[in-house]
Curated annotation (Swiss-Prot):
Family, as annotated: Belongs to the universal ribosomal protein uL23 family.
Name this polypeptide is given: Large ribosomal subunit protein uL23
Described purpose of this protein according to its UniProt entry: One of the early assembly proteins it binds 23S rRNA. One of the proteins that surrounds the polypeptide exit tunnel on the outside of the ribosome. Forms the main docking site for trigger factor binding to the ribosome.
An MF annotation (GO) of this entry: rRNA binding
SUPFAM superfamilies tied to this protein: Ribosomal proteins S24e, L23 and L15e
Keyword presence, DNA repair: no
A GO cellular component entry from the record: ribonucleoprotein complex
Complex and partners: Part of the 50S ribosomal subunit. Contacts protein L29, and trigger factor when it is bound to the ribosome.
């Protein structure tokens, strides 16, 4: 298993993530692309000391970006994890 600080890269804070946290108690993280659901669950439980009920993941391709006229590039691909805490567990990240 990877180090927990290599699995969880950062917390994703957006309007959608804030609404999810307020309504369903789900947290949204940007995680390592190679991390699986079991590693994400263990990393959140160890880092924050909370019990995790479920983890959903989504892979995102990097966007195409242009610099100057013809130099085309791409931003990095990344992975998002939606983590639902167990009943009675709360965590305020916002």
């Amino acid at each position: 298993m990877k180090d927990i600080y290599q699995v969880i890269k950062k917390v994703r804070i957006s309007e959608k993530a804030t609404m999810l946290q307020e309504t369903t108690g789900e947290l949204v993280f940007e995680v390592d692309r190679d991390a699986n659901k079991i590693e994400i669950k263990k990393a959140v439980e160890v880092a924050f000391g909370k019990k995790v009920a479920s983890v959903r993941t989504a892979n995102y391709d990097g966007k195409l970006k242009r610099q100057r006229r013809s130099d085309a590039g791409r931003t990095a691909h990344w992975k998002k994890a939606y983590v639902k805490l167990a009943n009675g567990e709360t965590l305020d990240l916002v």
